[in-house]
């Protein structure tokens, strides 16, 4: 926590000639920053009788909350599911490179792996604040190994697991300590899954439903046990059927706890999800849509063979497959590309597209007071965009951490 006195004495930055995303609208207002947080200018004027120490003209551009990616498996040759002696350096590389795509916070994601990989990797990726070194780490997303064999997708079958008699202890034996974990994806139809969901939720860990053959009733029961997220909607789950819509049916279910918002990840890369499916999901439940990249180590590398955990992946153009198959294996589209494709495919408002990559993931993780918003008091993590939503600059805690060459003075 920053000291109030220290913050009060810090320099005040005023970002002018901009449109800021606040309250679901793009407003022609200035953005004020001090001590790494968004400042209320009225308090500055009337209570402290101060003005800005520095003004920065944004040239009419958009200022939106920094993007938050809650499912990213690696990128730029780094595979988070590879048990190396220096996992941290790989995470740092990805954290630095994704700044150019407007991402200010992320959840490094591990795909299904043997226990020894989790035991070696998980302790090496702690929660970390963002800054000039790169985007902040909000905690790990462990996708598998407690998932369906039928809907395993690119996850290696040899390492899939079901829950043993003492289910939560079995999970701990698989993963090791959970201090660095923020999200766990599991299949709710697995025996004893509900006691695991309750135990994880009690520890403040978000439970996501995915890689599953669960019917709607099983999915609803999982939500009552504490699940709040769906991993890459439509992918690796039963297809929608009018008599039993499966997990997809959670978007419009009337059998959920009162006031509970179900969030769901969407890979809007132009490959994983047909534009019509994107439109259906968004129109059915817009406030729960969370854009994710599901990016793999091949992000930024081009065609050829790469790894993803224990599997080989082949990239051909804009698509990644498990080598030798036509099974999709994550995405190679960065977050800003997903935002632009989502906007174009759904015809939604620019505000909605931006909130799907910022506010909604923050709400999913319970961080909406500090992340995913430009409200007063929030962290000054934001992205500067042109009218076509190309990233011009990225700020973390009010500090410029990346700038496009064309935007440099």
Swiss-Prot record:
GO terms for molecular function: metal ion binding; N-acetylglucosamine-6-phosphate deacetylase activity. Pathway: Amino-sugar metabolism; N-acetylneuraminate degradation. Substrate binds at residues 154-155, 235-236, 243, 269-272, 328-330. Keywords: Carbohydrate metabolism, Hydrolase, Metal-binding. Its cofactor is a divalent metal cation. One of its GO terms (cellular component) is cytosol. Its EC number is 3.5.1.25. A divalent metal cation binds at residues 143, 211, 232. It catalyses: N-acetyl-D-glucosamine 6-phosphate + H2O = D-glucosamine 6-phosphate + acetate. It comes from the Eukaryota. InterPro entries: Amidohydro-rel (IPR006680), GlcNAc_6-P_deAcase (IPR003764), Metal-dep_hydrolase_composite (IPR011059), Metal_Hydrolase (IPR032466). GO terms for biological process: N-acetylglucosamine catabolic process; N-acetylneuraminate catabolic process; negative regulation of UDP-N-acetylglucosamine biosynthetic process; UDP-N-acetylglucosamine biosynthetic process. The active site is at residue 294. Binds 1 divalent metal cation per subunit. It is an enzyme of class 3 (hydrolase). Hydrolyzes the N-glycolyl group from N-glycolylglucosamine 6-phosphate (GlcNGc-6-P) in the N-glycolylneuraminic acid (Neu5Gc) degradation pathway. Although human is not able to catalyze formation of Neu5Gc due to the inactive CMAHP enzyme, Neu5Gc is present in food and must be degraded. Belongs to the metallo-dependent hydrolases superfamily. NagA family. This is N-acetylglucosamine-6-phosphate deacetylase. It comes from Homo sapiens.
